[in-house]
A protein has these predicted regions:
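Active-site-proximal, well-structured secondary-structure segments within enzyme catalytic domains
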Residues: 231
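Structured secondary-structure scaffolds
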Residues: 1-228, 237-257
Length: 257
């Protein structure tokens, strides 16, 4: 995964086009003056005051004009393009940390952040641009670690797609097998690799959880069970449990899920 990031970065040969021609998105806060014939002069840019942001140039007007001047000779016109989605989503860490507000305690306490969880297909977009923007504005990385997950594939190991009609929602799976069975299946996934939707694993997980539940219910149903008295086998179990917790914690901290 790191090699994919390196290859993308090292082979960039063009500038980042930050504008998109779409009907939705974050507006680019720019107007342009029109000449005496009503033609747009794209070199004569009108910028809003920072204190007025955010603005929509298709709705708001520059200070020296009125709405009636829009599209008229010696008037103005608003920028029609919107920002590339990665231009704005690459600011996610700063937005969460409330960068730019008067109280910067939260920004100073959580930025840079610890972990960015994301999928592998947007390494060259979301991960790359977020790092670029963090260096541009703060001269630092936005987070210490990136945790890359794979895709959930259908039973035939094909990418799930609405157009193909092979999407399986987690809600239906949880209702059929239970949340713990789904967790059991998810625990079998390896970091950075794709995982197949496998009902056999859900069935195994469901049976295992049911056995654990019944065993716990059986133990707790006996009044003779003395919680304050430890037998040798109880102490051995607690030692093994403590060792397991320490090992699992160590693995999690190293992202060895």
């Amino acid at each position: 995964m790191s090699k994919r990031f390196e290859n993308w970065t090292e082979n960039l040969a063009i500038d980042w086009c930050i504008s998109r021609q779409r009907f939705f998105g974050v507006p680019i806060p720019v107007w342009y003056r029109t000449d005496e014939k009503g033609e747009v002069n794209y070199n004569d840019v009108i910028l809003p005051n920072i204190s007025d942001l955010p603005i929509d140039p298709d709705i708001d007007t520059p200070d020296e004009f009125e709405e009636g001047d829009r599209g008229k000779p010696n008037g103005f016109i608003g920028e029609k393009d919107v920002f590339d989605t990665w231009f704005t989503s690459s600011m996610t860490p700063q937005i969460i940390a409330k960068w730019g507000l008067e109280d910067q305690d939260e920004m100073n306490s959580i930025f840079p952040m610890d972990i960015r969880p994301q999928s592998h297909e947007i390494i060259r977009t979301w991960a790359f641009y977020t790092i670029v923007k963090a260096y541009l504005h703060h001269d630092t990385i936005p987070w210490e670690n990136v945790v890359i997950s794979g895709w959930i594939l259908d039973p035939d190991r094909k990418k799930m797609s609405k157009s193909k009609g092979n999407v399986i929602t987690p809600v239906d799976t949880i209702e059929e097998y239970g949340a713990d069975a789904v967790r059991y299946w998810a625990a079998s996934a390896r970091l950075g690799t794709d995982t197949t939707y496998d009902e056999n694993v859900f069935l195994v997980g469901n049976k295992l959880v049911t056995k654990m539940y019944n065993a716990a219910k059986f133990v707790l149903s006996h009044d003779s069970y003395q919680i304050n008295k430890l037998n040798e086998i109880d102490a051995s179990f607690i030692r093994d449990l403590e060792e397991m917790v320490n090992n699992v914690t160590s693995y999690y901290e190293k992202f060895q899920f």
